[in-house]
């Protein structure tokens, strides 16, 4: 008999993960319009502001694993999730571009932490015999959020919805997700004794070529996902560009079949 995968705990963290990414993806394609219309930002400024989020998320990730092994995991997860959620409200009160950039950096740090801690916790609560299947469903939640989140955000924007409403939709999604996350029960894991943190623990020489390849792949991906809606508007495409993200998410599911072919 297989170990049970679909438990109350698993459903709760699956819902928390989906709602977090839904809130994230709902807002992402709308932000360039918001910065241009509200702060009168030019293209260079928009790119710099949006990149602050990604850079901040990347900077915290190498330290996230160390923190999760040193301190209790669920409190760190909830703290990061709450911070990520609260920043959506912060965007609403950001009266200057400088303050918006500050919130954007904090948002990126919390996103980097909450995603790593969420991945760690879901592994902890799953039976080891069904870990691959469980992680597959967990990743599928991200793809579903990616397929409908941007479409929802762009639909609201194209329909003339106020930016406050769009931000509140992301905030509401993550608030419900935070409630789901707080219901997840985790078992106590004693802290792992580690050597003092140092730079060399984050650098794997064998991984540099693969990391560089991923970097080159991520640059056009980031440019496309951030600017495709604005570009479509500039060249006169009338159809909703939200479907672009839907089809892209469907295409990303091909990785499952690729893995099967490789094995």
Question: What are the functions of these language-model segments?
Answer:
Residues 54-62, 146-147, 249-253:
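Residue-level signature of mid-helix packing/kink "hotspots" within the transmembrane helices
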Residues 75-89:
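Structural signature of the two symmetry-related core transmembrane helices
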Residues 60-72, 254-259:
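Helix-to-loop junctions at the C-terminal end of transmembrane segments
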Residues 105-141:
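Cytoplasmic helix-loop-helix junction between adjacent transmembrane helices
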Residues 171-190:
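C-terminal membrane-cytosol helix-exit motif in multi-pass small-molecule transporters
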Residues 9-47, 222-231, 235, 244:
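Helix-loop boundary and gating motifs at the non-cytosolic
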Residues 98-106:
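Paired small-residue
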Residues 1-7, 186-213:
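Juxtamembrane intracellular "pre-TM" segments in multi-pass secondary transporters
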């Amino acid at each position: 008999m297989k170990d049970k995968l679909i438990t109350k705990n698993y459903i709760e963290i699956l819902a928390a993960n989906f709602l977090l990414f839904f809130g994230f993806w709902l807002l992402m394609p709308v932000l360039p319009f918001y910065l241009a219309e509200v702060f009168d930002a030019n293209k260079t400024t928009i790119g710099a502001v949006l990149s602050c989020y990604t850079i901040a998320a990347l900077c915290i990730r190498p330290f996230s694993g160390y923190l999760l092994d040193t301190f209790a995991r669920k409190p760190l997860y909830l703290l990061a999730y709450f911070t990520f959620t609260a920043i959506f409200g912060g965007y609403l009160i950001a009266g200057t571009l400088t303050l918006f950039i500050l919130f954007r950096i904090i948002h990126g740090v919390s996103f980097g932490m909450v995603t790593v801690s969420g991945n760690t916790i879901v592994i902890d609560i799953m039976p080891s015999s069904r870990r691959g299947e469980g992680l597959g469903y967990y990743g599928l939640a991200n793809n579903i959020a990616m397929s409908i989140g941007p479409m929802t955000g762009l639909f609201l924007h194209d329909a003339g919805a106020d930016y406050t409403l769009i931000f509140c939709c992301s905030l509401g999604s993550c608030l419900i997700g935070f409630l789901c996350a707080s219901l997840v029960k985790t078992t106590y894991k004693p802290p792992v004794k580690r050597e003092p943190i140092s730079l060399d623990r984050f650098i794997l020489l064998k991984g540099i070529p693969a990391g560089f390849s991923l970097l080159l792949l991520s640059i056009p991906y980031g440019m496309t996902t951030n600017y495709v809606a604005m570009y479509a508007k500039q060249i006169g495409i009338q159809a909703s560009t939200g479907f672009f993200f839907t089809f892209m998410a469907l295409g990303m599911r091909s990785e499952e079949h690729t893995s099967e072919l490789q094995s």
